[in-house]
Design a protein with these regions (language model features):
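Glycine-enriched alpha-helix->loop->beta-strand junction motifs that scaffold or abut catalytic
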Residues: 9-10, 35-38, 57-63, 83-87, ...
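Active-site entrance/lid segments in N-terminal catalytic domains of soluble metabolic enzymes
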Residues: 1-90
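Generic enzyme active-site microenvironment
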Residues: 42, 90-92, 111, 144-145
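C-terminal helical cap(s) of enzyme catalytic domains, especially alpha/beta-barrels
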Residues: 130-136, 159, 172-192
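Glycine-rich phosphate-binding active-site loops on the catalytic face of alpha/beta enzymes
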Residues: 15-17, 54-74, 111-121, 161-182
Length: 192
């Protein structure tokens, strides 16, 4: 699957390593990172420097930090540790309060998750949260609309709201043809 995705016009590949709820592993991260020449994002509930060290050792290019799970000082410390290990940081928010909490931090990418991952929400959300919150993110960093992207229409909506990119997960795994699906998304027109 990673090689198939790597043959598409995508900016990178996201790998979930959380085991209990999502069935991922660090071995999967290492396998994907070794298999593709693209940047690989390590997605998990990262709360410690040890996890960041493991991300770097597995070949990740970037890590996800979830604002809802961390205090501001923890976020700052983990961002710094990631940079020391050569990793970019995608800091994720899902409401306006979280955006304000992280605005001053030196992360690389800002994500708006259209689902509330802290409660393992995996329902049929849409990009409405990105549409509601993108205007509060400023324009200094790349903004990524995460999750609930399942069509070219969703991509156009995210772009129209101010997102610079989208992170697609479940819809890729559910598609009958990964390459066809990804080409449909990447040819959606950005921004609309």
């Amino acid at each position: 699957l990673a090689r198939e995705m790597g043959g598409c016009p995508v900016a990178g590949i996201s790998v979930v390593t959380e085991t209990a709820h999502f069935g991922g592993t660090m071995d999967l991260l290492a396998t994907v990172a070794a298999a593709v020449p693209l940047p690989v994002l390590h997605k998990d509930f990262i709360i410690s420097e040890r996890q960041i060290d493991e991300s770097a050792a597995a070949g990740a290019s970037a890590i996800l930090l979830i604002t809802a799970m961390l205090e501001t000082d923890q976020l700052a410390r983990l961002i710094d540790h990631g940079r020391e290990r050569g990793l970019e940081t995608l800091v994720e928010a899902h409401d306006r309060k979280e955006i304000e909490k992280i605005r001053h931090l030196p992360f690389d990418l800002m994500g708006i998750n259209n689902r509330d991952i802290t409660i393992y929400e995996i329902d049929d959300s849409d990009v409405g949260r990105t549409e509601d919150l993108a205007r509060y993110c400023g324009g200094a960093r790349l903004l990524i609309s995460e999750s609930s992207i399942s069509s070219a229409k969703d991509v156009r909506r995210a772009g129209a709201s101010g997102a610079d990119a989208v992170l697609v997960g479940t819809a890729v795994l559910k598609s009958s043809s990964v390459q066809k699906f990804l080409y449909e998304l990447t040819s959606a027109g950005w921004p609309p």
